[in-house]
Amino acid sequence: MGLTISSLFSRLFGKKQMRILMVGLDAAGKTTILYKLKLGEIVTTIPTIGFNVETVEYKNICFTVWDVGGQDKIRPLWRHYFQNTQGLIFVVDSNDRERIQEAAEELQKMLQEDELRDAVLLVFANKQDLPNAMAISEMTDKLTLQTLRNRTWYVQATCATQGTGLYEGLDWLSNELSKR
């Protein structure tokens, strides 16, 4: 009974808590995205060794966002962050055609993990401001997202440095997670 009243109270007056894991290959723009969402500004970043964690409040949701480094030597550590993850943000450099296959393989590997079976997937197709950036349809194709069964996913075009598309992505994520 106490839990019911407490959850009703938080639904009416409080912010809903969500655990979000943000991963992707190195130099995709994860840390830039995190701090653009958190601070509303561009920060100078260096490659993330380990992780950054920040709370991002947006609308009625309090996202705890874990930004984990993407260098190939660090990727095996991603699995340590999977537990209790409700939303997975996979950031891809839309301009990096040479590594899109590598990104697709890493994403598919993660989506096989049991701990992420219920997580919704938001792909940020980042760096859309660059002239050679892949369109959303091409990105969806290269990441083989259309083969995903029993998984809610969405691809959002973004430009982290300008902030374009970031809040639209959070809107989609919050709408999907609120349904659960």
UniProtKB/Swiss-Prot annotation:
Compartmental location: Golgi apparatus
The record, for CDD domains, names: Arf1_5_like (cd04150)
Q: Which Gene3D superfamilies match?
A: P-loop containing nucleotide triphosphate hydrolases
Q: Where, by residue number, does the polypeptide cross the bilayer?
A: none
State the lipidation positions (N-myristoyl glycine).
G2
Keywords carried by this UniProt record: ER-Golgi transport, Golgi apparatus, GTP-binding, Lipoprotein, Myristate, Nucleotide-binding, Protein transport, Transport
Which family, according to the similarity comment? Belongs to the small GTPase superfamily. Arf family.
Query: What does this protein do, in the record's words?
Result: GTP-binding protein involved in protein trafficking; may modulate vesicle budding and uncoating within the Golgi apparatus. May be involved in ciliogenesis.
Protein known as: ADP-ribosylation factor 4
What is the organism of origin for this protein? Answer: Xenopus laevis (African clawed frog)
